[in-house]
């Protein structure tokens, strides 16, 4: 076998491989002989079919199989000999005879050679937060509101109330499509309506008729309403006030607390809040580290890896539609390209961190990750057992553990400062509510 390597563009490589023709002819002959031994043809005894008959019937197919095997086998031998690391499957060009050799071409991309740089320039502001009594009280108040009942009241509406109304909207004196409703229910403070609408409804009693003037936002979804000033004629028909449940043992049972009452409920809520806070703090630091790593290391990435990641993201997006994708057009790759590129770069760079730091997934860390995740379920022991019995899920958790270890390794050389933050402020920002 003779091999020549060319660089086409960037990470692209072209291998030209020559194989002695006699080697191929021998493989074809051996293939015909094997087929003759197992062939069952009318007019011939089993195993006695002439080789010429086998060649006439199956020779072309056997030769094609041999060519495919020759290309695959010699390609693998060639990349090992040339120390090439392909990213994705190769494309084989049709082979041709050159003198006494069979020559074929394989084109592919290789993984980039990565040398990590600028690790000491990564800047991380590590947030520090804890769950205090005020945070716990605020969470309990939120849970009370979530389990509130509503009762009709004879007073002016206020924030937190539910109101029922009839309204007609108009622009320049003309009604517009979608601007009219009867028995429309709205919770004041939900921010469901355009700016100014809920404020205009606040302070009115059932039975009152009044007008409010508002403007549709410039980014409103309906093109014909963007930025337009509108008037709504409103008749308020009902005001309901929230009735919050008392925090007692009965309230605790709503959350699966069967013993220990309010104290047990508070302990469980604090535990859950602390777990979520720790996860959010860890995710925040990880994002900063990865952003710094990307900024310090520009990596050329193989298009084959991007294409593969695009397909993964596309399938995930389709699955979020609940599998109802039969009649849906395929989502364009452009929707996922930027995210795919980022994910591939992160994978390559973290992979290099793991390799250069000689990291291996620590069993204790893997089990701690599983236990932490399982604690959010009703039967944690069952979840832990399920993970430990599933090879694929265990491998996923090992990958998560390795990522954590890689981030910790990067933190050792990063410029780290700390900042005290309030629980509510930090969690709102982490969830995108700030």
Curated annotation (Swiss-Prot):
Keywords: Cell cycle, Cell division, Chaperone, Cytoplasm, Isomerase, Rotamase. One of its GO terms (cellular component) is cytoplasm. GO terms for biological process: 'de novo' cotranslational protein folding; cell division; chaperone-mediated protein folding; protein transport; protein unfolding. InterPro entries: PPIase_dom_sf, PPIase_FKBP_dom, Trig_fac, Trigger_fac_C, Trigger_fac_C_sf, Trigger_fac_ribosome-bd_bac, Trigger_fac_ribosome-bd_sf, Trigger_fact/SurA_dom_sf. It catalyses: [protein]-peptidylproline (omega=180) = [protein]-peptidylproline (omega=0). It is found in: Cytoplasm. GO terms for molecular function: peptidyl-prolyl cis-trans isomerase activity; protein folding chaperone; ribosome binding. Signal peptide: none annotated. Involved in protein export. Acts as a chaperone by maintaining the newly synthesized protein in an open conformation. Functions as a peptidyl-prolyl cis-trans isomerase. Consists of 3 domains; the N-terminus binds the ribosome, the middle domain has PPIase activity, while the C-terminus has intrinsic chaperone activity on its own. This is Trigger factor. The lineage of its organism: Bacteria, Pseudomonadati, Pseudomonadota, Gammaproteobacteria, Alteromonadales. The gene is tig.
């Amino acid at each position: 076998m003779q091999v020549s390597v060319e660089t086409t563009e960037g990470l692209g490589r072209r291998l030209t491989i020559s194989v002695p023709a006699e080697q191929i002819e021998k493989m074809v002959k051996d293939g015909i002989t094997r087929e003759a031994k197992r062939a069952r043809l009318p007019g011939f005894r089993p195993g006695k079919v002439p080789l010429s008959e086998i060649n006439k019937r199956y020779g072309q197919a056997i030769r094609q199989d041999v060519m495919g095997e020759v290309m695959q086998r010699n390609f693998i031998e060639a990349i090992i000999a040339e120390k090439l690391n392909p990213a994705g499957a190769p494309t084989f060009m049709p082979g041709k005879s050159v003198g006494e050799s069979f020559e074929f071409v394989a084109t592919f991309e290789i993984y980039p050679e990565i040398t990590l740089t600028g690790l000491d320039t990564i800047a991380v502001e590590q947030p520090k937060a804890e769950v205090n009594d005020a945070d716990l009280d605020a969470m309990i108040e939120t849970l009370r509101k979530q389990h509130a009942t509503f009762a009709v009241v004879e007073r002016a509406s206020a924030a937190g109330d539910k109101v029922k109304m009839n309204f007609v909207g108009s622009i320049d004196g003309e009604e517009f499509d979608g601007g009219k409703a009867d028995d429309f229910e709205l919770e004041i403070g939900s921010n469901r309506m355009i700016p100014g609408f809920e404020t205009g409804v606040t302070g009115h009693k059932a039975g009152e008729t009044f007008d409010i003037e508002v403007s549709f936002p410039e980014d409103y979804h309906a093109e014909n309403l963007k930025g337009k000033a509108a008037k709504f004629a409103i008749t308020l028909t009902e005001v309901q006030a929230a009735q919050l449940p008392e925090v007692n043992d009965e309230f605790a049972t709503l959350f699966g607390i069967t013993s220990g009452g309010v104290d047990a409920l508070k302990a469980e809520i604090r535990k859950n809040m602390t777990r979520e806070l720790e996860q959010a703090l860890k995710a925040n630091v990880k994002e900063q580290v990865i952003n710094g790593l990307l900024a310090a290391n520009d990596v050329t990435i193989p298009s084959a890896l991007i294409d593969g990641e695009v397909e993964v993201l596309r399938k995930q997006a389709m699955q979020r539609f609940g599998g109802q994708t039969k009649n849906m057009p395929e989502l364009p790759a452009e929707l996922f390209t930027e995210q795919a590129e980022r994910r591939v770069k992160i994978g390559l760079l973290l992979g290099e961190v793991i390799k250069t730091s000689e990291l291996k997934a620590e069993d204790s860390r893997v089990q701690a990750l599983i236990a932490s995740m399982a604690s959010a379920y009703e039967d944690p022991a069952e979840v832990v057992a399920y993970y430990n019995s599933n090879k694929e899920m265990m491998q996923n958790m090992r990958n998560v553990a390795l990522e954590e270890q890689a981030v910790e390794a990067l933190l050792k050389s990063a410029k780290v400062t700390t900042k005290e933050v309030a629980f509510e402020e930090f969690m709102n920002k982490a969830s995108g509510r700030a």
